[in-house]
């Protein structure tokens, strides 16, 4: 009898050991799936190409040094002193702190970390839905060409992560459990999100649609808890330095950006990339509906509809769609095919690692094709500068002593101002009148305005490269 008990104990101990080993092995597989995304993120961080990044760093530095958020425009001569509401003040401080610690490489690494957080949350949700780590990781790698261009150093990275966190929390609220604590967690996420980026207001709408979807399922209890989460999230939206003013600011950004900024344009049905991203989202929506996962149905409905109205939401749609697609692919012949052809994946990953190592030599470098470092340094101090939309933010960062005419804070300048300056940049209209208040001009050398200035005796070309030409008024 004692021998039998001992043998049973030994078998039980062995079984527990095997399960623990399996858990550790599976955990390592998910970690490797997450780590495989790192080379692509590093490649994106190698060059800073987004103009917003530069004025956000400078604004964050200003906030830190003054220990107060700027309330009026301090950077331009066209809007100087005009009231200014920041939609990402905490993100600005975050990357400014990274800049103070490690310069532009610190900013690039910080934003790369945010991108990796979003990828990790995507894989976490895929794991909860029953996906294979290999398939989920492979799917993330295959779709990375669609995502990499959107992983620039901007507060939108926070949006990608926050939407996934909300999806995870809402699914747990719908499933039951400690719902009070989960609702409070939604509130905390909302407060952090709205201070990092005003995109949190989109999350409030997403929660409410999830509540409606659960109501349609006749799960009244879960729907009620989701509504409570939505109310808490809505209240959290006003726990920022701007309070209720954030609502008006969000509307102002949308109205000033529509038809001007590319990422705010409607979906282009002739774009294969945009259509592929939307197709992934719609496919995930169908799968979520078939599984009767009404939380994910609600999330995907809102993000897909938003993506049609503004393509800036397409990467968010892909991040939410991948965890839904991965479990289905894990149970199809696709999974076996990927395993048999994994050598192709490994080779592709090896190439990405090599390219990432090359990019690590210039992490955080401003794109030489867009930002003329040497020319900007040649601008005379305190010279009122007429500049192109993209170059303004870089001048704010590199030369805060030079007031600009325009930059990518389009909510500050307004749609009409941006369009009028684009017309002048083309050399059209009454160019002399538009330049009346400027002493210097910094524009790409191939623009109509640059050609006009070369032929005008009142201006002198003082510096030029492939990205920009600097003209100074002759007195």
Residue ranges, per PLM feature:
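Membrane-interface alpha helices of multi-pass inner-membrane proteins
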Residues: 40, 143-147, 181-198, 232-237, ...
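Transmembrane catalytic cores of multi-pass membrane glycosyltransferases
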Residues: 52, 64, 69, 192, ...
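Transmembrane-helix motifs of polytopic, lipid-linked glycan transferases
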Residues: 109-129
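Specific aromatic-rich, kink-prone transmembrane helix
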Residues: 121, 146, 158-176, 207-211
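Short hydrophobic alpha-helices at membrane interfaces in multi-pass membrane enzymes
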Residues: 172-191, 223-228, 296-301
């Amino acid at each position: 009898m004692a021998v039998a008990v001992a043998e049973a104990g030994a078998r039980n101990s062995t079984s527990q050991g095997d399960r623990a080993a399996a858990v550790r092995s599976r955990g390592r597989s998910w970690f490797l799936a997450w780590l495989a995304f790192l080379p692509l993120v590093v490649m994106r961080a190698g060059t800073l190409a987004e103009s917003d990044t530069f004025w956000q760093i400078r604004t964050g530095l200003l906030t830190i040094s003054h220990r107060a958020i700027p309330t009026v425009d301090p950077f331009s001569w066209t809007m100087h002193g005009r009231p200014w509401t920041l939609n990402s003040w905490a993100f600005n401080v975050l990357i400014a702190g990274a800049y103070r610690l490690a310069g532009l490489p610190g900013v690039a690494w910080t934003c790369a970390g945010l991108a990796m957080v979003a990828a990790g949350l995507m894989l976490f949700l895929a794991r909860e839905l029953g996906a294979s780590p290999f398939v989920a990781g492979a799917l993330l790698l295959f779709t990375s060409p669609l995502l990499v261009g959107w992983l620039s150093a901007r507060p939108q990275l926070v949006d990608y992560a926050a939407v996934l966190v909300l999806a995870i929390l809402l699914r747990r609220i719908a499933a039951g459990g400690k719902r009070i604590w989960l609702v409070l967690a939604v509130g905390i996420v909302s407060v952090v999100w709205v201070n990092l980026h005003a995109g949190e207001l989109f999350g409030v709408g997403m929660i409410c649609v999830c509540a409606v979807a659960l109501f349609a399922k006749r799960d009244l209890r879960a729907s009620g808890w989701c509504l409570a989460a939505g109310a808490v999230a809505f209240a959290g939206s006003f726990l920022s330095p701007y309070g209720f003013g954030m609502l008006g600011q969000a509307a102002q950004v949308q109205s000033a950006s529509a038809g001007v900024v590319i990422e705010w344009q409607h979906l282009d049905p002739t774009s294969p990339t945009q259509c592929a991203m939307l197709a992934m989202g719609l496919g995930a929506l169908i799968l979520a509906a078939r599984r009767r996962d009404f939380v994910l149905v609600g999330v995907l409905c809102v993000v897909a509809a938003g993506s049609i109205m503004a393509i800036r939401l397409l990467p968010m749609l892909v991040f939410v769609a991948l965890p839904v697609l991965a479990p289905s692919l894990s149970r199809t012949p696709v999974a076996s095919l990927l395993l048999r052809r994994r050598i192709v994946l490994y080779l592709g990953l090896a190439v990405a690692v090599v390219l990432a190592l090359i990019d690590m030599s210039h992490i955080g470098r401003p794109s030489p094709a867009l930002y003329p470092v040497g020319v900007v340094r040649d601008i005379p101090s305190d010279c009122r500068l007429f500049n192109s939309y993209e170059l303004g933010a870089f001048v704010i960062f590199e030369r805060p002593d030079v007031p600009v005419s325009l930059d990518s804070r389009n909510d500050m300048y307004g749609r009409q101002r941006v369009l009028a300056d684009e017309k002048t940049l083309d050399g059209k209209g009454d160019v002399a009148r538009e330049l009346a208040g400027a002493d210097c001009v910094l524009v790409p050398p191939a623009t109509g305005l640059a050609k006009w200035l070369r032929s005008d005796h009142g201006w002198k070309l003082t510096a030029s490269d492939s990205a920009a030409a600097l003209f100074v008024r002759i007195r």
